[in-house]
Amino acid sequence: DITFQDMLNQWKIVPSKFASGLFKAKLKIGEEYVKEFKRSFDLKKAPGDNGRFWPLRKNEHRYHHELMNETGDLKDSISYQLYEGGGLMIYTDENKFRANGRRNDAFKSYAAFHNDPTGTWPPNIQRKFMGDSPLVELKAQLILYNLLKSII
């Protein structure tokens, strides 16, 4: 038999179990997004971009590396961060770029060089590698559903 007090004591555990599970769920969701955005470099298209592949280079003979993969730094810089209060941000971490940029010493990355508002280049986003992904959103929903199922 279970007493009323035993039942109340059992429910005291649930909030901490939920908080712990939510933290782990956010980590999993962040890892899923990072994995999907890094995969866009192999697929040569942004996730969920209606099947549109990145445009080819205008001069293929000039470069001897994969499209969007001169050093691999941009792909390797994709990361995520948890914020207090429930937030999760996916971003490119400029600290993961090599010390000297190959285009211009003031910028460590090709993306930063082309998207700098003070530079001579206008913003020029030609090959999107991060964005909404219905597949990852579905995975995130499943992760949260499993979390709720585990505490009920």
Predicted regions and their residues:
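Short, Lys/Arg-rich flexible segments
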Residues: D1-I152
